[in-house]
């Protein structure tokens, strides 16, 4: 397998702690425990009998780990691994002799689909087959619409076009994309798999099917918002003079509400003037019938006055154009007579009639029988407000009549004596059917109608002319998947007829019973070939084609130039990353052993707030040449800690970030060093503490930071197996502590010098700032060591050193 490597380089040296000597370290592999006479410090020994790994230190072989480990519980099945890198290309083989072409075999019976054959080499282009003849087009007879029939029998299969002449079998080509699914023919003898034919023409568009039966009236929709104000109606004829009623105050004309869903039928009021018919909207939900204005309180019936002149009837509004009639819904059951509806919005005041003669006061008439409530007329559109008429003479106050039924609120006239309720006007002529009212709220979607019987399987559409046999084998661009052919002998599905115009939406009645399935529409004539449709759904999987003949073996390539003789070294390469942040790397091909070296981020030197010096930062924990067994392709995950920020006059030094590494089941944590405090601040002048190290072999604690005001000096880092903890940073005028032979940062003890940074396992700590004889600013740490502390000259400490990760790979 080949792997792509990043950040690999040739073997480079790693600075050793001064306390170790690992020059020319070796790895021994043998059976049994090693003898201390064998090898030198720094060597490794693998006992193949027990898989124990030993490391020689101070002349003694020390057991550090067992590579086998106890069998763990069966893990959860992992996700499929990514494809491995492509292997190296083998040498080209010799070209084989080309076999002579065999005779075509007899056509055999169609067998079961075989397994997919191996992809062959691209074969030679086969000869084009003859184009088959186009089959005859079947006639589509339109029958009369009858009752919904059962799904018809499957139509006869149209005649297949002539089969193209079989071309010579070419060498097996690369496996092509699945071709369009052709019409399934009658299963015949297994033929030679032909090449994909040209896409047949799309059938002609079918005739529009007969209109389906009217659905059952849906439930009444909810009352809609009040509709928009309509145009002013034509002036009506002058009616008989009514008795002067008490003239009410002119009310404000209410805004016409938005049309809402259809409300419950109220009591049918007197028929109003027919308003202009509005333009037919798209059939929508029945809007709410315009809300009637608020019902006024019934006033005391005034004395019957003389009948005043009836105001001139407004001109009748022009009848609007009749909208297209929608499909009528089934007439719903007549609803119960509803409560009298609220009084509608006040219409515009009609032209003032001429003043009538004052009549004699009449005797109080008997209360007439209440007339039967007339059918409620269609509510006309609200007319424009007419000019106010002249005030008539006040008639003599008549006897108070019985309270009549509240009529629809008329136009407010001038206040006269309240007259007896006028006779109910004749029912107006029924207005022309307005455009079908907006359909009430759309009823819940009815059960999906049975799928219209699939048009009788149309006569099998003309079979597309058998395409010329394409070049066999060459993998063409994947063709557009054709329209999915009807399975089996079914004729090609005709184009879906264009959607019929939506009829005006009828009033939504109560949800009716599921209607009978509509009659199947006559299959329309085949339309002209349409533009290429969108890619159709994937057709049924075709029969497995015959395995093509394996191509000839390619010619053997020229031998490559002989490479230079390599050195016999097990070293493969080194991976290094010293940029803070997270990353991954992959164990390279051939590697079975590796050494890990890494460091966390060092702590930053402190700040200063007065003339005293400030402490240094602590160093991070480190790992040095930790031995590992690895496998090619293993992913190593890591996070590199950054060095702590330098202190300022108002802020202490920042702590270094932790470095973590995960290699298989092994985890390493290298804690960053602590930041130095702020000089001159009580309780905050201590040096930063060193970071600890945790490996599979245990935890090594870090050194403590120096304590200000004459407290304890900083603690040195500790040495563990392949691990060095960070040393503590020194307080003001104190050197930082050391680790593994690397000293801490130095300070100028004769002045108010800054404390030195702690040392890491790979570098000395940053020196503190000095003032005499010249001012030298505090130094930053490197490779995880701590930064030096400042004096009051700069007041800012050195930054902590960033961490890093390094892996050296070996094949043996």
UniProtKB/Swiss-Prot annotation:
Glycans are attached at residues 13, 83, 502, 637, 658, 667. Residues 71-568, 730-802 are annotated as: Disordered. PANTHER family: COLLAGEN ALPHA (PTHR24023), COLLAGEN TRIPLE HELIX REPEAT (PTHR24023:SF1082). Residues 752-765 have a biased composition (Gly residues). The lineage of its organism: Viruses, Varidnaviria, Bamfordvirae, Nucleocytoviricota, Megaviricetes. GO terms for cellular component: extracellular space; virion component. Residues 88-112, 121-435, 444-523, 531-561 have a biased composition (Basic and acidic residues). GO terms for molecular function: extracellular matrix structural constituent conferring tensile strength. It is found in: Virion. InterPro entries: Collagen (IPR008160), Collagen_superfamily (IPR050149). One of its GO terms (biological process) is extracellular matrix organization. This is Collagen-like protein 5. It holds the Pfam family Collagen. Its main location: virion. May participate in the formation of a layer of cross-linked glycosylated fibrils at the viral surface thus giving it a hairy-like appearance. Residues 69-128, 143-502, 506-565 form the Collagen-like domain. Keywords: Collagen, Glycoprotein, Hydroxylation, Repeat, Virion. May be hydroxylated on lysine by the viral-encoded procollagen-lysine,2-oxoglutarate 5-dioxygenase.
């Amino acid at each position: 397998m080949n792997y792509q490597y990043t950040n690999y380089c040739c073997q480079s040296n790693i600075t050793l702690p001064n306390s170790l000597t690992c020059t020319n370290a070796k790895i021994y592999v043998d059976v049994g425990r090693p003898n201390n006479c064998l090898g030198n410090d720094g060597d490794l020994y693998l006992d193949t009998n027990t898989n124990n790994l030993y490391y020689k230190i101070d002349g003694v072989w020390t057991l550090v780990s067992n590579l086998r480990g106890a069998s763990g519980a069966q893990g959860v099945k992992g996700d499929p691994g990514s494809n491995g890198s492509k292997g190296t290309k083998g040498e080209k083989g010799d070209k084989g002799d080309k076999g002579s072409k065999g005779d075509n075999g007899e056509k055999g019976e169609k067998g079961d689909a075989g397994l997919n054959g191996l992809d062959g080499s691209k074969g030679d282009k086969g000869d084009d087959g003859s184009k088959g003849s186009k089959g005859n087009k079947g006639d589509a007879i339109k029958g009369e619409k009858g009752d919904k029939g059962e799904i018809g029998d499957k139509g006869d299969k149209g005649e297949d076009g002539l089969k193209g002449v079989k071309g010579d079998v070419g060498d097996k080509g690369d496996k092509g994309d699945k071709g369009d699914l052709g019409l399934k023919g009658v299963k015949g003898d297994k033929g030679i798999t032909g090449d994909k034919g040209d896409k047949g023409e799309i059938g002609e568009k079918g005739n529009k099917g007969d209109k389906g039966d009217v659905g059952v009236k849906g439930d009444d929709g909810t009352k809609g918002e009040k509709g928009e104000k309509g145009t002013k109606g034509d002036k009506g004829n002058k009616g008989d003079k009514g008795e002067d009623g008490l003239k009410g105050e002119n009310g404000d004309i209410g805004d016409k509400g938005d049309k809402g869903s259809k409300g419950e039928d109220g009591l049918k009021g007197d028929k109003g003037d027919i308003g202009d018919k509005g333009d037919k909207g798209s059939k929508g939900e029945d809007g709410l019938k315009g809300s009637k204005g608020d019902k006024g309180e019934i006033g005391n019936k005034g004395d019957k006055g003389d009948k005043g002149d009836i105001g001139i009837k407004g001109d009748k509004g022009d009848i609007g154009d009749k909208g297209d009639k929608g499909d009528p819904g089934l007439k719903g059951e007549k609803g119960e007579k509803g409560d009298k509806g609220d009084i509608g919005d006040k219409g515009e005041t009609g032209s003032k009639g001429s003043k009538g003669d004052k009549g004699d006061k009449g005797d109080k008439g008997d209360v007439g029988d209440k007339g039967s409530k007339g059918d409620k007329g269609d509510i006309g559109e609200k007319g424009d407000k007419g000019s106010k008429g002249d005030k008539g003479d006040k008639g003599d106050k008549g006897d108070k009549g019985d309270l009549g039924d509240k009529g629809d609120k008329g136009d407010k006239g001038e206040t006269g004596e309240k007259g007896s309720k006028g006779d109910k006007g004749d029912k107006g002529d029924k207005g022309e059917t307005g455009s079908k009212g907006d359909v009430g709220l759309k009823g819940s979607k009815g059960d999906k109608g049975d799928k219209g019987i699939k048009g009788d399987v149309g006569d099998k559409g003309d079979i597309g002319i058998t395409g010329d046999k394409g070049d066999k084998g060459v993998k063409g661009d994947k063709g557009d998947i054709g329209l999915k052919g009807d399975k089996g002998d079914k004729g090609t599905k005709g184009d879906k007829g264009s959607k019929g115009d939506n009829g005006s939406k009828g009033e939504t009645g109560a949800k009716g019973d599921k209607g009978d399935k509509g009659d199947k529409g006559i299959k329309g004539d085949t339309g002209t070939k349409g533009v290429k449709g969108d890619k159709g759904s994937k057709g049924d999987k075709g029969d497995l084609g015959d395995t093509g003949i394996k191509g000839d073996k390619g010619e053997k390539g020229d031998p490559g130039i002989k490479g230079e003789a390599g050195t016999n070294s097990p070293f493969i390469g080194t991976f290094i990353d010293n940029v803070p942040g997270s990353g991954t790397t992959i164990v390279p091909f051939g590697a079975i052993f590796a050494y890990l070296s890494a460091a966390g981020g060092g702590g930053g030197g402190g700040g200063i707030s007065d003339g005293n010096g400030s402490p240094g930062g602590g160093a991070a924990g480190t790992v040095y040449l930790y031995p590992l067994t690895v496998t090619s392709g293993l992913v190593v995950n890591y996070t590199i800690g950054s060095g702590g920020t330098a202190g300022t006059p108002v802020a202490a030094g920042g702590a270094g970030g932790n470095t973590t590494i995960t290699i298989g089941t092994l985890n390493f944590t290298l804690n960053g060093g602590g930041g130095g405090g702020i000089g001159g601040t009580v309780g905050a002048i201590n040096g930063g503490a060193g970071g600890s190290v945790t490996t599979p072999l245990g935890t090594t604690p870090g050194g403590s930071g120096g304590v200000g005001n004459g407290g304890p000096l900083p603690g040195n880092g500790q040495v563990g197996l392949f691990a060095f903890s960070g040393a503590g940073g020194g307080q003001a005028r104190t050197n930082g502590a050391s680790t593994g032979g690397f000293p801490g940062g130095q300070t100028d003890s004769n002045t108010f010098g800054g404390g030195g940074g702690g040392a890491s396992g790979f570098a000395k700590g940053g020196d503190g700032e000095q003032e005499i004889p010249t001012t030298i600013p505090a130094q930053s740490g490197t490779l995880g060591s701590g930064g030096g502390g400042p004096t009051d000259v700069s007041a800012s400490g050195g930054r902590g050193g960033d961490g890093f990760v390094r892996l050296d790979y070996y094949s043996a």
